Amino acid sequence: MGRVVVDVMPKPEILDPQGKAVAGALPRLGFGQFTSVRQGKRFELEVDGPVTPEVLAAAAEAAEQVLSNPVIEDVVRVADAEADAAATISSGNLA
């Protein structure tokens, strides 16, 4: 069974009150090095079988038509979750 990850973010010109609230809290909690936060959404779509280019194309279409509001959001990533996790682990980043 495969899995596709879709990340959606607010368009840059759209106010992000959740991100602003998090950005305000970070310095108070000892994380002053972060100056800005944008909060988005992550979707994980499971499929029967492997993630093929056709599955990724269908996920991208679903992301544009159903998972995001194109007036205020951008789809910033559609990826095979397994390949994405392998890249994250090999780079030493947190998964």
Region roles according to the model:
Residues 1-95:
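Non-catalytic terminal accessory/regulatory regions of metabolic enzymes
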